[in-house]
UniProtKB/Swiss-Prot annotation:
GO terms for biological process: translation. Keywords: Ribonucleoprotein, Ribosomal protein. Belongs to the bacterial ribosomal protein bS16 family. It holds the Pfam family Ribosomal_S16. GO terms for cellular component: cytoplasm; small ribosomal subunit. This is Small ribosomal subunit protein bS16. The keyword Ribonucleoprotein applies. It comes from the Bacteria. The keyword Ribonucleoprotein applies. One of its GO terms (molecular function) is structural constituent of ribosome.
Length: 91
């Protein structure tokens, strides 16, 4: 089972709102997910992002792969930097 951290589209037509979720890669975009780890609202100015850092770092350490968009959101929040520092300073 390959696990991904990706966006799940919510909201109404022309007013998107996304949940950052951990899901099996085989499940559909808006289908079943394992855990919700944040939200992303691109409609507000500036875009509003909330993330559960501990949960995301735990999933990344267990092998979850973020999608390209989620990787950008995590980098802007500084979570990817924390992950890489923790991963490469253990050795």
């Amino acid at each position: 089972m390959s696990v991904k951290i990706r966006l799940k589209r919510m909201g109404s037509k022309k007013r998107p709102f996304y949940r950052v979720v951990v899901a099996d890669s085989r499940s559909p975009r808006d289908g079943r997910f394992i855990e919700q780890v944040g939200t992303y609202n691109p409609v507000t100015e500036p875009a509003q992002v909330t993330l559960k850092e501990e949960s995301i770092l735990n999933w990344l350490n267990n092998g979850a792969q973020p999608s390209d968009t989620v990787k950008t959101l995590l980098s802007n929040a500084g979570i990817m930097k924390q992950y890489h520092e923790a991963k490469y300073t253990k050795k």
